[in-house]
Amino acid sequence: MEEAFQLALDSAPFLLKGAYYTVILSLGGMFFGLVMGFGLALMRLSRFKSVSWLARIYVSFFRGTPLLVQLFVIYYGLPQLGIELDPLPAALIGFSLNMAAYACEILRAAISSIERGQWEAAASIGMTRAQTLRRAILPQAMRTALPPLGNSFISLVKDTALAATIQVPELFRQAQLITARTFEVFTMYLAAALIYWILATVLSHLQNKLEERVNRHDQES
């Protein structure tokens, strides 16, 4: 037991380096996923059926296929089309595209939950649809979308372990490499699991604090 604990301590710098890549992938995937997801949500809500259906097809594909398969298509498949990507950019693109599909549905549902009368009231005072969306609808919709978006972000942190399959040196990959050298399977994978758990716990705490702050602001106003 003492030797296993010492090994975990000695391996900490490598695991923390992997955790750094895990955080980078998570933050990048969430940021780009939100940006694309918002655009897709607007497409889903479009009055033009062709535009709406394009977004529907995108969401259906990325929600209906395994994330691991999507990563393999990007990293191993695209080179056959002349598009070669390094592991980290390939993983970031894969996570962003996947997150965009889920963010799209979360944001679409949140925007749709706002009463139609608010759009009509804004139009009656001369506001354009873009102004109404930015000033009136989005602030309310984001309060509704915050909990599921936070949960999706926590899930993304755990899903980044899949990047190990395309050689990204994130947390799980580092644990694999150390295990291959030391054969201490239980110790290293447990150490990696604890770091994932710490990251998820911190994010969950931050999410709860943010939700409490938003709710308190709503009550005060």
Regions found by a protein language model. Give the residues of each.
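Transmembrane alpha-helices and adjacent helix-loop boundaries
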Residues: 1-221
